[in-house]
């Protein structure tokens, strides 16, 4: 039967005539040299051009090759020059005249720093690129153009050449003369290539006589001649993996011949003109073709190698028709790292009469099936004796070790048991593939049917699906149906099916409805897979080794290249994988972890607890993440050994004790910040404060202290934030603290915000307005003297600041009120309620109506409520007032300013200024000196002397009870100094007379 060929076109590009092609060994690139003098590099996966080189305009580039280890391309053209380029940087590395005529071919030595070039000058030359591209040997012997060269893969010191003198000559790099000559073609020979597989000493040639000849270079005879082309044969090669000979001709076709039977298997014609060049990538299934009209890349066959492993660790694989065996058990006592290539000894097991395209052990490992060339053969696994054979496009084993099925054609399926046919049936659709396992699966282009192995009855028909593969679990309870886009995990109810069959009910076209249930869909493209218990292990298109338990997918490893799963061996606890070159690696698979996860998914928590002690410590974190994903966060917190993960779980569970313990161990500001936020949200104020301090979360501390009214905390935060340079926090703290408004002005001035400082003083601290205005004026002089002169000081221009004297009185009034403890506010609140019951209060009117005598009286009586125990004494300043100013209304503002002398520090505002980037204040602003008409601001020395003259120490409180140290942090009312439009009535302040006063201390005032 014909060889099953899976041919896919990976690239097709249009261009000028392509004289040579070469495939990169590691990148998905093909190099094409053109008749127009250009060289292109194409990516055959993305279909895009990667690089373009203009090598020799108007001179054909007849040959080009990759030198991958140097990241070079080397070209030969009709101008007789060899040129070398770096294909990454596009830099020209070397250019030299190599021959006296057109350069026809260049090949690169697989290991040594050599290239060979041939030319129409009839010479072959050897070049050493590690020695400055020196010419180390010249080979002479042909009498016509030398068209092609090929290295012998079995002896890389030898090479063969083809010439238009109708001969093939075999050479050694150590001798300038040929060892022997092969003659037989009637016309010039265009191409020569060695057979790379097996032990056959063959080479192949194609010539202008339209023939392809196979030569035995040991006996120096022609073994076979292939006829079929209708024009000159331009190029020939052996497929690197499949038993194929490929030949390209000027008749526009590529013919595929079986290398053992020499039967023509397939003819390809892509309508792109003459075939000029062909190249293969050793170890792969990619073939590059160069045509008159462009470049084509084909993938012939599948990458999956013919290899199988039994439960004992014996690996049987095929190298062409040769069968070899290795034993994994020799490595079980060795310490092997995950992903490490295993060093295995192999031995010949025998040969196979067909070319193996698939190779499979049965369930007990006693027999091995080989399928290929449209036939199957069953061998004994140990002695490699033929047990059975027959025709088959595909072969699959059943779960029962003695049953198997073959697909003879698209219309005939046969089932065998103990090497005897038991059933033969014709599906109702075109059978495009079959799958083994607990049931026999048969697919068409859009349908999947499952059949009973014993009766061939349909069990279930699934429409609109055509899987790539099906993997059954060992107990037959689960299966994975792999499609192009996703994989479906199904549960098979064998007991339900068995009862239905035993009931004798007829089975319809769709089979038994309750035979399967969809458990989960894995949205991933899967290459190979296998089951270990109820765990499905697979490799996806991204070369990730994953396993799926229930609905949870876990990545075991990221593979460096695509690999294929072989088997899991319980005795070693490892998974074994193979690449396409039959290099075998392994990865540790912890069955205890999978068993634990399976128990959790089944709800068997007691069973999971029994398994937990068997799980290694280095796998506890993966278990914890699994438990978290399943909603068992408390259990995950117990199991996890990762501090970061445990902290996250403790935060989610609001377990403050565990979270605090972990935060202390790790000493992480981030952890303290998260813990502080959580503690604050659930009312653990003390813990929140400690965590926010350790995290240096100043905004969080500000929120905490303002919410709880912690004045000591506010003081600490004001100092800390200033040290840390977060002056916006410091500003807000001082804004809310009693007697700290001056610090706010200091902050604004330090940041250069003199205008804001002046306006803030005008609103909340009128006594500081002159000083702030002067600083503002001074700051403007360097930029705009005109703007500086336009600013007015309330001392120099009192007419521009009406009622300025009232704002100063209000400042003193509210300063006294703010200096009281909470207990005094409760008393005043009761007294005020009596007044409010009579009429509505108007605070502005009260302030304007206060006489100097009343003001002094209030001030003296409020001294008894000053905070001197644990906070600070209130230092008030006053001066002898004019005894004659007892009138209710102040008619002369100027005289009042002459008589008032004070210092102040108050709190309040809602204004905030971001001054994080400003410098710290070098020294705090001085309290203002007494303001007198037509006087300038007093010097600091004078201010200090005046303050010493008028400072009054607050007397002790009358009430011996402890003073409440917490202050009420309430924004101070804005002092509006705008003049009222009409005269305000005198305020009723008689309630102030009721404030108890210690008369023994009154004389001090």
From Swiss-Prot:
GO terms for molecular function: structural molecule activity. GO terms for cellular component: COPI vesicle coat; Golgi membrane. The coatomer is a cytosolic protein complex that binds to dilysine motifs and reversibly associates with Golgi non-clathrin-coated vesicles, which further mediate biosynthetic protein transport from the ER, via the Golgi up to the trans Golgi network. Coatomer complex is required for budding from Golgi membranes, and is essential for the retrograde Golgi-to-ER transport of dilysine-tagged proteins. Pfam families: B-prop_COPA_B_2nd, TPR_COPA_B, WD40. It is a peripheral membrane protein. Residues 908-918 have a biased composition (Low complexity). The keyword Protein transport applies. This is Coatomer subunit beta'. Residues 908-948, 973-1005 are annotated as: Disordered. PANTHER family: COATOMER, COATOMER SUBUNIT BETA. Residues 919-929, 974-987 have a biased composition (Polar residues). InterPro entries: Beta-prop_COPA/B_2nd, Coatomer_complex_subunit, COPB2, G-protein_beta_WD-40_rep, TPR_COPA_B, WD40/YVTN_repeat-like_dom_sf, WD40_repeat_dom_sf, WD40_rpt. The keyword Metal-binding does not apply.
